[in-house]
């Protein structure tokens, strides 16, 4: 991902304020509610029958935290996203058979959740930088599919 020094600074400054536990669960939960077909990958998570059930599900929250932990690793290695996400790409492709389009959807949901949490601080410039990052992460996660 090519970010200007200003974009990198904006991304890392905002990320330092992110509550990974809260935002991770919310982002994954929203993905499962807004794109219900993604729930098929999480059948072992129990009750996902209503938006409230999804958003309150402890397994959704725990996995969302795990997902954002991996995203944090990616932010620390923006110049090597394919290497950083190689094992996760292989896992999601070969073992879990996740449609790589879901990575793009989750990235877009994450941007929406960040905008909601940070309001005016999530300026158009910050959003543009985050869109680049989530697109880069989605491409890295889809790498083994090509």
Swiss-Prot record:
Q: By its UniProt entry, which PANTHER family does this protein fall under? A: HEMOGLOBIN FAMILY MEMBER, HEMOGLOBIN SUBUNIT BETA
Checking InterPro entries in the record gives: Globin, Globin-like_sf, Globin/Proto, Hemoglobin_b, Hemoglobin_oxygen_transport
Could you give a single Gene Ontology term from the biological process aspect?
Answer: hydrogen peroxide catabolic process
How is expression of this protein distributed across tissues? Red blood cells.
What domain of life? Eukaryota
Q: Where, per the database record, does this protein carry N-acetylvaline?
A: 1
Name of this protein: Hemoglobin subunit beta
**What does the record note on quaternary structure?**
Heterotetramer of two alpha chains and two beta chains.
Q: Domain Globin, which positions? A: 2-146
Per the entry, what this protein does is: Involved in oxygen transport from the lung to the various peripheral tissues.
Q: Which SUPFAM superfamilies match?
A: Globin-like
Arranged from A to Z, the UniProt key words for this protein are: Acetylation, Heme, Iron, Metal-binding, Oxygen transport, Phosphoprotein, S-nitrosylation, Transport
Residues modified to Phosphothreonine? 12
Record family assignment: Belongs to the globin family.
Identify the residues that bind heme b.
Answer: 63, 92
**Where Phosphoserine occurs along the chain?**
44
| Location of S-nitrosocysteine modifications | 93
Residues carrying N6-acetyllysine: 59, 82, 144
Q: Give the Gene3D superfamilies listed for this entry.
A: Globins
Could you name the Gene Ontology cellular component terms for this entry?
blood microparticle; haptoglobin-hemoglobin complex; hemoglobin complex
Molecular-function annotations in GO:
haptoglobin binding; heme binding; hemoglobin alpha binding; metal ion binding; organic acid binding; oxygen binding; oxygen carrier activity; peroxidase activity
């Amino acid at each position: 991902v090519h970010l200007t020094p200003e974009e990198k600074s904006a991304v890392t400054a905002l990320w330092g304020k992110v509550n990974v536990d809260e935002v991770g669960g919310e982002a994954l939960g929203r993905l499962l509610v807004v794109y219900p077909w993604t729930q098929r990958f999480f059948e072992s998570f129990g009750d996902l029958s209503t938006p409230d059930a999804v958003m309150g599900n402890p397994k959704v929250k725990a996995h969302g935290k795990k997902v954002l932990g991996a995203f944090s690793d990616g932010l620390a290695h923006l110049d090597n996203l394919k290497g950083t996400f190689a094992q996760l790409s292989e896992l999601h492709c070969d073992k879990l058979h996740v449609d790589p389009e879901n990575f793009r959807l989750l990235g877009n949901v994450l941007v929406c959740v960040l905008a909601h949490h940070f309001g005016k601080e999530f300026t158009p410039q910050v959003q543009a930088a985050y869109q680049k990052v989530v697109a880069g992460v989605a491409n890295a996660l889809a790498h083994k599919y090509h």
